[in-house]
């Protein structure tokens, strides 16, 4: 993976992948507070909205996503905050197969953090590498057919979230 401007990228490869949008937001959490709502991550929602706006896409345009699933509930919360489904519907979204091949969006085709490991400091790079492979049609048996727009979500602790939108087109 090489980061380069659009013009240079087109001279390096005939299958460039472009970063089309980014968003970052931070919320403070008091883990000792009984008043915090840990099932909603407003910073993730703000980061996603910013990335979608910059990329000129919405949640329904995403073909494949790598989300930060450091524990099972984190993935479900991410589905809702990223706009893949409505609040309170993540369980039904997964049960209906909407986050799998043939569904609305294929999430974590390489197994996510739970399936592949969570190397602190390198997780985001691993996610980007999977997105890169997907958008270049180089993901082998994990390949999402026709993937053209992708998303990665990473977070630090519970309060800082980064969302990136990638595409085959600039």
Give, region by region, the residue ranges found by the protein language model.
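A short beta-alpha structural unit
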Residues: 22-25, 63-72, 113
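Active-site-proximal alpha-helical scaffold in enzymes
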Residues: 1-7, 119-139
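Short, well-ordered amphipathic alpha-helical segments that serve as non-catalytic structural scaffolds
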Residues: 40-55, 130-136
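Short acidic capping loops at alpha-helix termini that bridge into adjacent secondary structure
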Residues: 58-63, 87
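Catalytic-loop motifs flanking and including active-site residues across diverse enzymes
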Residues: 40, 44, 71, 121-127, ...
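A glycine-biased, small/acidic residue-tolerant capping/turn segment at secondary-structure junctions
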Residues: 85-97, 139-145
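Condensing-enzyme catalytic core mediating Claisen C-C bond formation in acyl metabolism
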Residues: 1-46, 50, 98-110, 114-116, ...
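Short glycine/threonine-rich loop-to-helix capping motif typified by GTGT followed
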Residues: 31-36, 69-92, 119, 158-165
């Amino acid at each position: 993976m090489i980061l380069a401007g659009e013009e240079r990228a087109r001279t390096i490869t005939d299958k460039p992948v472009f970063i089309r949008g980014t968003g970052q937001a931070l919320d403070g959490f008091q883990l000792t507070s009984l008043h915090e709502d840990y099932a909603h991550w407003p910073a993730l929602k703000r980061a996603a909205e910013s990335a979608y706006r910059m990329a000129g896409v919405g949640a329904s345009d995403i073909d494949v996503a790598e989300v930060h699933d450091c524990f099972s509930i984190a993935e479900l919360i991410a589905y809702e905050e990223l706009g893949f489904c409505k609040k309170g519907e993540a369980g039904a979204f997964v049960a209906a197969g909407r986050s799998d091949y043939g569904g609305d969006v294929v999430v974590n085709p390489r197994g996510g953090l739970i399936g592949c490991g969570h190397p602190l400091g390198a997780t985001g790079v691993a996610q980007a590498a999977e997105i890169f492979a997907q958008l270049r049609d180089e993901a082998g048996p994990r390949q999402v057919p026709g993937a053209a727009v992708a998303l990665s979500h990473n977070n630090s602790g519970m309060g800082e979230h980064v969302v990136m939108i990638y595409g085959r087109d600039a």
